[in-house]
Design a protein with these regions (language model features):
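C-terminal helical "lid" subdomain and adjoining coupling/linker elements of P-loop NTPases
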Residues: 1-4, 11-30, 126-134
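AAA+ P-loop ATPase catalytic core
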Residues: 1-12, 94, 112-116
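Intrinsically disordered, low-complexity segments enriched in polar/charged residues with Gly/Pro
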Residues: 8, 17-18, 43, 101
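Soluble catalytic regions of large protease machineries
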Residues: 29-33, 39-178
Length: 178
């Protein structure tokens, strides 16, 4: 049934809900506005919505809540506009906190990681950089996952290119935040 499918979707997507976790009223309020920020942008921006589930119940992965879009099926190709809107949605929680409370919390740390990852992939993997062009700056072994993977590892590009990549990633994230 739909309820079982939703529970499975939540467990896979956010590690399940941690209902035993005691949350203060203040933290619950912050989480509610934070998740509302994501939900509003999912609703307003093309390619990324619509919203399927919004929850302020803490997750097994440590998040205070979550906002999940309705699954759009298997997508073979994702456009630059879609990735930019994913970055914007990931910033929605922090923006909502700033608007409502005049400040923001550490609650957006995973959102920041996601936004940075999307922007870096756009520049280094997908050739979507205006300044660095249609070039892949990732080496095949960058996808290896093991402790110490960077020991003795050299990048397949110069320090000048590394600085340009960092600058381009920052520029994409900054433009999406505005």
């Amino acid at each position: 049934n739909k309820e079982d499918v939703d529970k499975s979707y939540i467990k896979v997507g956010v590690g399940g809900e941690k209902r035993s976790h005691v949350v203060s009223e203040e933290d619950r309020k912050i989480t509610a506005y934070h998740e509302s920020g994501h939900a509003i942008l999912f609703h307003l921006l093309p390619y990324v919505g619509p919203v399927h589930i919004v929850s302020i119940i803490p997750t097994g992965t440590g998040a205070g809540g979550y906002t999940m879009p309705l699954p759009q099926g298997d997508q073979e190709y994702i456009t630059k506009a879609h990735l930019l809107n994913e970055i914007k949605v990931s910033m929605g929680g922090r923006i909502a906190e700033k608007i409502i409370f005049g400040n923001f919390t550490t609650g957006a740390s995973q959102d920041i990681k996601m936004a940075s990852g999307y922007a870096r992939s756009m520049v280094t993997k997908y050739g979507m950089s205006e300044n660095l062009g249609f070039i892949n700056y990732e080496s095949d072994d960058q996808e290896e996952v093991f402790l110490g993977k960077n020991l003795g590892h050299t990048k397949p590009y110069s320090e000048k290119i590394a600085a340009a990549i960092d600058e381009e990633v920052k520029q994409i994230v900054d433009e999406c935040y505005r």
